[in-house]
C-alpha cells in the first residue's frame, strides 16, 4: 500500500485583500512549518518524493519543514479565491467581505458561483477539478510514500473526489483545514 500525505501551508497573511498580499507566511507560519518538519522527520519519514505548489507560502512551508530537495508542481496551487471574489463583486453577485469572519459564508457562495459558471476567475471550475484529480492520480503510487505541500482548497477537493461529495460538502471540508495540518490518503493497488 502507498500513501499520499497532504500538508496545508503554514499561516499566511489572513488580513490580505489580494492573492499577492496573502501569499507569504507570517512569523507563526514559519514556526509552524519548522515544528511540523521536526515532527515528521522524527516520527513519519522518510518519503519517496516531496512535492510543493509554486506559491510562495507553499515553498516557504516545505523548505521550513526541512525538505530542501522537492519538486515544484503548480497543480498543487490554491484556488485563486481573491480573484474569484473580485469577479463576484464586479458582477454584483455578492457583497464585499468586511472581515475575515465573513469567509465562512462567502467561501461556499463563491465556490457555488464558480461551479455554476457565473464566474471564471483565472481558471474554470472544471479545469480546477481536473488539475487536482491529475496531481492526486500521479501521486497515487502503490508502495510509495509521497508528501505534497499544498493548500486547503486542494486538500478539500481531493477528499471530496475520493468521497464523491458535492461542492457544498467540499466547502464544509475546506473551512476547518488548519495551517500545517496533515491529511493522509492510502493508495491501494
What are these regions (language model features)?
Residues 16-19, 63, 81-86, 160-161:
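Short aromatic-enriched loop/helix-cap "lid" or pocket-rim segments at secondary-structure transitions
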Residues 2-73, 126:
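Active-site-proximal alpha-helix that buttresses catalytic centers in soluble enzyme cores
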Residues 52-53, 130, 149-150:
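Short beta-strand scaffold positions
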Residues 43-46, 139-144:
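Glycine-rich phosphate-binding loop signature in dinucleotide/nucleotide-binding domains
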Residues 166-188:
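Domain-level recognition of soluble alpha/beta enzyme cores
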Residues 152-156:
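GST superfamily/GST-like fold recognition
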Residues 66-131:
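Phosphate-handling substructures
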Residues 4, 144-150:
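Generic beta-sheet signal
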